[in-house]
Each structure stands twice: as structure tokens, then as C-alpha cells.
């Protein structure tokens, strides 16, 4: 993992077309601004993990009944 230090207002580039800017730092939280093409999906990791967990629980609760054909 690459770890960088940035101050408010400073930007880093990911590839040629994604800009990540530190917008603010307050009470231990960092606010980030992200400029990226519309086809780049940006999601918070905790939401992805929550959705994956819910999908796994739903899949486990499904019961498939196999019926023999006569």
C-alpha cells in the first residue's frame, strides 16, 4: 500500500483522469473530493462489505427443493 501525506487543498492523481483532493480535515475525519469519469464507479468500502454480507445471508437462507421427475 502506498501511503502519502497531503494537506488541505492538495491533490493527487490516479492514472490520467482521476483526481483525489483533500477538501478538509476536522475532528479526526478527512473530507475528500473525487473527480473521475462517469464510468468509474466510486463506493465506500463499508457499504460494499455490508451489501456482500447481506447477499451471502440471503443466499444461505434460500432452500432449493429438488423434485424427481417421473
UniProtKB/Swiss-Prot annotation:
Main location: cytoplasm
Similarity comment: family membership: Belongs to the CsrA/RsmA family.
A GO CC annotation given for this chain: cytosol
The protein, known as: Translational regulator CsrA
Known role: A key translational regulator that binds mRNA to regulate translation initiation and/or mRNA stability. Mediates global changes in gene expression, shifting from rapid growth to stress survival by linking envelope stress, the stringent response and the catabolite repression systems. Usually binds in the 5'-UTR; binding at or near the Shine-Dalgarno sequence prevents ribosome-binding, repressing translation, binding elsewhere in the 5'-UTR can activate translation and/or stabilize the mRNA. Its function is antagonized by small RNA(s).
Compartment(s): Cytoplasm
GO molecular function: mRNA 5'-UTR binding
Subunit structure: Homodimer; the beta-strands of each monomer intercalate to form a hydrophobic core, while the alpha-helices form wings that extend away from the core.
Keywords from the named record: Activator, Cytoplasm, Repressor, RNA-binding, Translation regulation
GO biological process: mRNA catabolic process; negative regulation of translational initiation; positive regulation of translational initiation; regulation of carbohydrate metabolic process
Amino acid at each position: 500500500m502506498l501511503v502519502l501525506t497531503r494537506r488541505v487543498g492538495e491533490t493527487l492523481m490516479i492514472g490520467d483522469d482521476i483526481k483525489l483532493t483533500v477538501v478538509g480535515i476536522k475532528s479526526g475525519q478527512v473530507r475528500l473530493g473525487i473527480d473521475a469519469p462517469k464510468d468509474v464507479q466510486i463506493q465506500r468500502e463499508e457499504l460494499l462489505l455490508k451489501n456482500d454480507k447481506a447477499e451471502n445471508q440471503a443466499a444461505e437462507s434460500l432452500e432449493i427443493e429438488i423434485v424427481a421427475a417421473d
